């Protein structure tokens, strides 16, 4: 039996474990503070559900492990500075940017990047945290410790957000899912919609870009690339060197889920192109209690993470997939009264994708 240790024991590790069971792959999600002696890592392939981690007894051991897949890639992608430098090196389109080193740079920043600046911490900061949208009269809002520790990007006037989830094997082969349409609110992914056939031009551009990135890094496994949709084409926003929230729909909407695909890649199992036959919708459950009335709707698949419910915390998701888009939109309509009021706009957005 193959064994995989996942650095991190959140919901992504949990879903990797679930995906491993049918394949006979024992997956062990482990907390960063676990005692090394209690973790069966010696004969395991090592992967991670997070981009960066503190130094602990366990992470020191794993850093030396010869089967820690992508170990040297994580630091490059975890730092937005080196991530952006990678895009520039490969001549891939991304929002104009620079390192924000000193407060005195602001006039030149706005002169170069325009009236809206997006400041992001180089490391950490996700789901809208560690980011600021600033105009010239608002720069005093930025904490002093951010200088030297943040990048600043041009604010992009985009018409939509999409992500590409793909995987690369040890032999260099790559496979991809169709582009996923994403709705973010307050920096948090709320809803995703995927179709069997994405826009051909966007799909081709996205696959070419993500292939170049994975090839350059020698990356193995699933990677996600978030992009802005603009009249000039796609602009890369950020990368995630792991399974990704916007790929959760694949659990019920594809022949191979992103979680199984990642395990296949890192354990050197066959990596065929996943088949997607039907449209899918994913709704993130954020800071909401479970409601089993959702399961009265036959298209709804509930994935509950069994985490303490707190405001702003991802605690589960709902997947819906069907060949009949009218049945999908009707089910989404029936979900609205079963969800807290703040979900309505995301559900209506998903319905709008089906015309």
From Swiss-Prot:
Domain ATP-grasp: 84-267
UniProt entry keywords in alphabetical sequence: ATP-binding, Ligase, Nucleotide-binding, Purine biosynthesis
GO molecular function, one term: phosphoribosylaminoimidazole carboxylase activity
Pathway(s) of this molecule: Purine metabolism; IMP biosynthesis via de novo pathway; 5-amino-1-(5-phospho-D-ribosyl)imidazole-4-carboxylate from 5-amino-1-(5-phospho-D-ribosyl)imidazole (N5-CAIR route): step 1/2
InterPro entries linked to this entry: ATP-grasp (IPR011761), ATP-grasp_carboxylate-amine (IPR003135), ATP_grasp_subdomain_1 (IPR013815), PreATP-grasp_dom_sf (IPR016185), PurK (IPR005875), PurK_C (IPR040686), PurT/PurK_preATP-grasp (IPR054350), Rudment_hybrid_motif (IPR011054)
Enzyme Commission no: 6.3.4.18
Pfam families the UniProt entry points to: ATP-grasp, PurK_C, RS_preATP-grasp-like
Listed GO biological process terms: 'de novo' IMP biosynthetic process
Entry-linked SUPFAM superfamilies: Glutathione synthetase ATP-binding domain-like, PreATP-grasp domain, Rudiment single hybrid motif
Function: Catalyzes the ATP-dependent conversion of 5-aminoimidazole ribonucleotide (AIR) and HCO(3)(-) to N5-carboxyaminoimidazole ribonucleotide (N5-CAIR).
UniProt family annotation: Belongs to the PurK/PurT family.
SUBUNIT field: Homodimer.
Protein name in the entry: N5-carboxyaminoimidazole ribonucleotide synthase
């Amino acid at each position: 039996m193959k064994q995989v240790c996942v650095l991190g024991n959140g919901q992504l590790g949990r879903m990797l474990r679930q995906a491993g069971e049918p394949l006979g792959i024992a997956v062990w999600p482990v907390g960063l503070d676990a005692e090394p002696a209690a973790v069966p890592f010696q004969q395991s392939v090592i992967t991670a559900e997070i981009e960066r981690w503190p130094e602990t007894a366990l992470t020191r051991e794993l850093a030396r492990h010869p089967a820690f897949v992508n170990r040297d890639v994580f630091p490059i992608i975890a730092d937005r500075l080196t991530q952006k430098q990678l895009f520039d090196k490969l001549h891939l389109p991304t929002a104009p940017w620079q390192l924000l080193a000193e407060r005195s740079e602001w006039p030149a920043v706005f002169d170069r990047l325009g009236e809206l600046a997006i400041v992001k911490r180089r490391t950490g900061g996700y789901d809208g945290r560690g980011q600021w949208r600033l105009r010239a009269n608002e720069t005093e809002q930025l904490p002093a410790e951010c200088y030297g520790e943040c990048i600043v990007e041009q604010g992009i006037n985009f018409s939509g957000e999409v992500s590409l989830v793909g995987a690369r094997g040890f032999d260099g082969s790559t496979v991809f899912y169709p582009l996923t349409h994403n709705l973010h609110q307050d920096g948090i992914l709320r809803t995703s919609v995927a179709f069997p056939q994405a826009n051909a031009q966007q799909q081709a551009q996205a696959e070419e870009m993500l292939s170049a990135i994975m090839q350059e890094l020698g990356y193995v496994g699933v990677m996600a690339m978030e992009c802005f949709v603009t009249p000039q084409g796609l602009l890369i926003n950020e990368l995630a060197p792991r399974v990704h929230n916007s790929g959760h729909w694949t659990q019920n909407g594809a022949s191979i889920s992103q979680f199984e695909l990642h395990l296949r890649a890192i354990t050197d199992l066959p990596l065929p192109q996943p088949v997607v036959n039907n449209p899918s919708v994913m709704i993130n459950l954020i800071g909401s209690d479970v409601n089993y009335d959702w399961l009265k709707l036959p298209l709804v698949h509930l994935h509950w993470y069994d985490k303490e419910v707190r405001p702003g915390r991802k605690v589960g998701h709902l997947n819906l997939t069907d060949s009949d888009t009218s049945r999908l939109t009707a089910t989404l309509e029936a979900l609205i009264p079963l969800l807290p009021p703040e979900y309505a706009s995301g559900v209506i957005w998903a319905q709008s994708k089906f015309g």
